[in-house]
Regions:
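Active-site HxH/HxHxD metal-binding segment of metal-dependent hydrolases
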Residues: 1-38
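Conserved small/polar residues in nucleotide/adenosyl-binding loops
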Residues: 2-8, 175-184
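Hydrophobic packing residues within well-ordered alpha-helices of enzyme cores
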Residues: 16-17, 164, 186
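A short acidic, often aromatic-flanked loop/helix-cap motif at beta-alpha or helix-coil junctions
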Residues: 35-40, 53-55
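Short, flexible hinge/linker loops that cap or flank conserved catalytic cores
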Residues: 39, 62, 146-149
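Histidine-centered active-site/metal-ligand motif
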Residues: 43, 54, 125, 163, ...
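Metallo-beta-lactamase
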Residues: 44-131
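N-terminal beta1-alpha1-beta2 submodule of the flavodoxin-like/Rossmannoid cofactor-binding fold
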Residues: 132-178
Length: 186
């Protein structure tokens, strides 16, 4: 009789063996297939592979009863859970730093997720998302397809004496563009 059973992808088990000094007995491992489901009585979990949404072995899990998508690194954000703050800014920073180079893989996951009736998204990092899910999914679609969130032009410059700053601001003075200056202290 087993005391513990780990369900994961074959790739995950291979990575554990390759990178860690851990031996999981074969009788405690159950490799799941993409789309495979597990009944836990009232809850039915479906495993959906999402390779390279940050890591090669990523898998998300969907609970059909409560309509919860456990999204791994997808839809995560930086920040503390006990601080009220807008999700978008820190989620954008998280996406760019952690998941951003895997846009095609995120797009593939979004297509798979579109077939699910999702009420809650629970990422590994950040708060559970319960309201206005279309907003979060739309932002992930924009970010992962490398489209601009809003129209604009960025002129990046550094200026010790102010001359480069004056030159960089010339295009703004001759157009209908509005200037927004952000200073970075390096």
């Amino acid at each position: 009789q087993r005391q513990m059973c780990i369900r994961d992808s074959t790739k995950t088990f291979a990575m554990i063996a390759d990178f860690f000094d851990i031996t999981i007995p074969e009788e405690n491992k159950v490799a799941v297939a993409n789309g495979e489901s597990l009944s836990l009585g009232a809850h039915q979990l479906t495993f959906v592979f999402a390779p390279m949404v940050h890591w090669p072995e990523v898998m998300v899990t969907y609970d059909a009863k409560d309509k919860v998508l456990f999204s791994a690194d997808g839809f995560g954000k930086f920040g503390a859970l006990d601080v009220e703050e807008e999700w978008d800014c820190e989620a954008r920073r998280y996406y760019i730093g952690i998941v951003g180079k895997y846009g095609a893989q995120v797009q593939a996951l979004l297509k798979k997720a579109a077939a699910l009736d999702i009420a809650i998204i629970c990422p590994l990092h950040g708060p559970a998302l319960k309201d206005n899910l279309a907003h979060y999914i739309n932002l992930y679609d924009i970010w992962s397809s490398y489209r601009a969130e809003s129209e604009g032009v960025m002129i990046a410059y550094t200026s010790v004496y102010g001359h480069t700053k004056a030159a960089a601001q010339l295009p703004v003075s001759y157009t209908h563009l509005r200037a927004h200056e952000t200073k970075a202290n390096l």
